[in-house]
Every structure is written in structure tokens, then in C-alpha cells.
Amino acid sequence: MLSGCGGDDERPQPAPPPAPDLFGRPRAIAVQDGPFAAGPFTPPARGAYVGAWIKPDELTHVGRLAAVGSLESSLGRRLDILNTYRRFEQLVGTESDQEFLAQGQSLMISWATGDNRSILDGEHDRLIRAQARAIRRIKRPVLLRMRWEMDRPNLRATMWSGADYIAAWKYVRDIFRREHVENVSWVWCPTAEGFMRGDAPDFYPGDDQVDWTCVDVYAGASFQPIGELMEPFLRWAAQRPKPIVIGEFGVAKAWGSANRAAWLRDAERTFKANRQIKAVAYFESDPEGNGPNQQFQLSGDEAAFKAFHSLVKDPYFNVTD
């Protein structure tokens, strides 16, 4: 009887998942050397640009300048690329945009275009033309991520389908062409999860429509090496004659300081091994309302920030010096 009473407690427990290997040699998958037809925003001949989205305390001119300036001061260098998010109706060329451009930095514009079918019905032509002219006026080459992460399930109501997204992409790009915009490199940027599911390629507009391929990749809900998280994307992108930008990457606070530092060191090695990756941008933000597995800011985490600092100071990521 005594042994029977304890039976439930003595059942073998499932083994914990193995710890991720963050110290092995990363796989070299996307290794094309170019030269690439990448549009006006040209990739470096060797190495990669480095950048970030830095969430300001206030979404104002002063707030944006302060956020970027504070991070760059801590890093001891200017970032090559600044990721900036715009709603459909928000035009490029703000005061802070102009200030960053005057400092010699480049913009990656993440533009949240709206419902694809309403775009195709011509409901937003005036707005699209206004954005095209605004980008043309800044003259400097920019990276434009038209409705990045279009493959997310929670965007399906406005994306409708891969075919609708592709048609809207071509429609918007044609308006830019008719407005004589010649300083945009078109960046197609789904999620790493979309490649794991297998549906992200359904949204690809085609090699003749895209200048840079891109992916957003996070160690958020699960702690895996970046090479594993984006391997399906890299295998796909290796077959495209395009440079790659890692549009957003991050490792969540939930995984602890030492693990975050190891993950970032592994990310640096992975970027170097896959030399088709020509730009990377960290997501330096703790979005409001998110739990620890969706908070990615490195500032304030000494070990993790030190690992990122090592990445941005490495000669491989200082191609404009």
C-alpha cells in the first residue's frame, strides 16, 4: 500500500530540453559575395552595416535625438542605419530624420501600409504619392520596408493573401516610379516564424521587385540560437541574388543576462559566417505592456550590453570607417 500511494510521484518526469549550443561554429548558409543589384542603397563590399531601432522616451524630435545619442555615446560610435517606424499616413522627412541624415546616418523606413485591397482599389493613391515625394526630397538612399512582417497571422485581415500583398507591392512601387523616386531600395522583410511555418515565401514579390531580402528574428518565447531561428530563411535567401538585412533582432530579458550575452556573441559569429548578410539592426526596446519574454532592451544589462558593444566595435561591422 505504501508503495502504491507514492506511485504518481515516482513516475519518470520528461527530460528538460537540451541547452542551446551557443558556442559551436555557426553554419555558413547564405554566402554569396555579390556584386548585388541592390538598388541605390548599396551593400558594403565586405563586412556589414550595423544599426538599431532605439525606442525614445517620447516620440518627438528631441526624444528621438536623445535616445539615439545616448545609445551611441555608450557604444562609442555612430550607428550606420537607424530603423524608424511610420504609420501609413506618417511622412518621411521629419526634423529628426533630417538631423540624422545630416550626421551621415542612413534611414531604414518601416512603413505600415494599410489594407492591401483598399490600396489596389486606389483609395490611398494621394497618400502614397505624398510619401513618394517626401522620400524623393530627402535625396539620400534609403531602405524601405513596405509593410514588414506581412506574414504575421494577426495581419491577415488586412494583408488578405500573399497574392494581394504582391499586387499591392507592385502597385505602390509603380506609383513611386511614376513620381521619379530613385533613392529607394525596396526591402522585403517577413518573420523568421513565417519561414518555419512555410508560408512567408508566398508573399515574395519576385527578384525583379525586391532589392534586399530581410528577416526579423527574436529569441523571445523560446531560447534558441539565432542561426537555428533563421535557418529556413537563410536557406531560402541563399538562392536569391540579393543582399540580406536583419531588419530586427533581439534576445529577451526573460533569459537572463549571461544567456543574453552568449546569444549575442553567437549572433555576431553567425552574421560573419553568413557573409550575404550585409546589414543588421538590433531592436533596442521594451515595448509597453509586454512581459519579460518580449522585452529586448540591452541598456542597463551590463553583460548583454558588453556583448553588443563588442559586436559594434568589431572591424567587420565598421565598414564606413
Each PLM stretch: what is its role?
Residues 95-105, 110-112, 215-255:
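Glycoside hydrolase catalytic-domain groove-lining segments
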Residues 51-55, 173-198, 243-254, 279-285:
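Aromatic-lined carbohydrate-recognition surfaces of secreted/lumenal glycan-active proteins
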Residues 2-4:
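C-terminal motif of bacterial Sec signal peptides marking the signal peptidase cleavage site
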